[in-house]
A protein has these predicted regions:
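Aromatic-rich, lipid-facing transmembrane alpha helices and their immediate juxtamembrane interface loops
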Residues: 1-130
Length: 130
């Protein structure tokens, strides 16, 4: 449970920080989405530990993109909060997701999965030494 809470906290902090760096602002809903997305990335890393890291990143990207679509449809379209709008981006879906930002998520997933692999190896080594 502690590991899940830590993963959620990392995502809830990191996701908004990425948005602030990229866009200059964020919204509290992005903290919730970030926490959920990092939990999903951790699950993928644990479920498929030997999988090629690019394939893991593609799975992570698919989850994040789907989550952004779902959250965007609620916070932007249904509630009208206007947290983000990709309607001017090529290939956008209802202004909520687009290929460019999915590509960015893929690039960000690569080092995340690399770090998760290192953490798993470190944990395994630490456990075997006890």
């Amino acid at each position: 449970m502690k590991e899940k809470a830590t993963a959620f906290a990392v995502g809830a902090t990191g996701y908004p920080c990425i948005e602030i760096l990229a866009r200059g602002h964020t919204h509290w809903s992005m903290a919730l989405l970030g926490g959920i997305c990092v939990l999903a990335l951790v699950w993928i890393a644990r479920r498929y530990p030997g999988m090629n890291i690019a394939v893991q990143a593609a799975l992570g990207t698919a989850f994040i993109t789907a989550a952004e679509l779902a959250v965007g449809l609620v916070v932007n379209r249904a509630l009208g909060w206007q947290v983000w709008d990709y309607s001017r981006e090529f290939g956008n879906v209802l202004g909520q997701i687009c290929p460019l930002f999915s590509f960015y998520w893929f690039l960000l997933c690569l080092p995340v999965f690399g770090l998760l692999r290192l953490a798993a190896r470190w944990k395994a080594k630490r456990t075997s030494e006890v």
